[in-house]
Amino acid sequence: MLRVVLADDQDLFRAGFATILGAEPDIEVVAEAPDGAAAVRAAREHRPDVVLMDMRMPVLDGVAATRQVCALTTSRVLALTMFDTDDYLYAALRAGASGFLLKDAPRADLVNAVRVVAAGDALLAPAVTARVIGELHRRGHPDPARVAAVTALTARETDVLRLIAAGLSNAEIAAHHHLSEHTVKTHVGNLFTKLHLRDRAQAVMVAYESGLVIPGQ
């Protein structure tokens, strides 16, 4: 059973999400929160698999709440936003969010998003990814700390990181290199450990911030 906390300051959205997710036999909404601070408390108390986190909330905004949830728990955060141009997108990924979902997404997409993020995968819609890459391009120069961390990877781990940033799954990376999927999982696990990553969304950020992958190429 996947355990979910809903964090949104609008009652209507929380009720709608709760109804949709509650209809799934493998998903349980264990708590709701009307602001970021309450979301952090709920995550610490209930230890959910996923926190659906609205980005614009009172008391503590979604970015700050995401940072605290990721630091204090093993829960994964799926950020919610009304617009794919939201200025919070980049900051939330930096804070540890595993992906983004637009609030007007079809109900099937909401259910799938929860399952994908709970499984440890990233959920980055093309429009959202483009926005984040655009922000990285605007920043211009690679992050020296990220460069140093990526330099410490083996050649194979570096290549796997590059392919993760390109959106390939473990199975696709295995086929690309004629490796077993188990071997690829080992490489992914090793590079996650070395780079202190929680999931593939963070791996994508590191690949771009280190200059391993260049926006636009």
Go through each PLM region and give its residues.
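Active-site residues of response regulator receiver
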Residues: 8, 54, 81
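Short hydrophobic/Thr-rich beta-strand motif most characteristic of the beta2 strand and flanking loop
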Residues: 26-34, 42, 197
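Acidic catalytic/metal-coordinating carboxylates
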Residues: 35-38, 59-64
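Short, flexible helix-to-coil linker/hinge segments that flank and couple to helix-turn-helix
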Residues: 89-94, 99, 104-155, 159, ...
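Recognition helix of helix-turn-helix DNA-binding domains
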Residues: 167-202
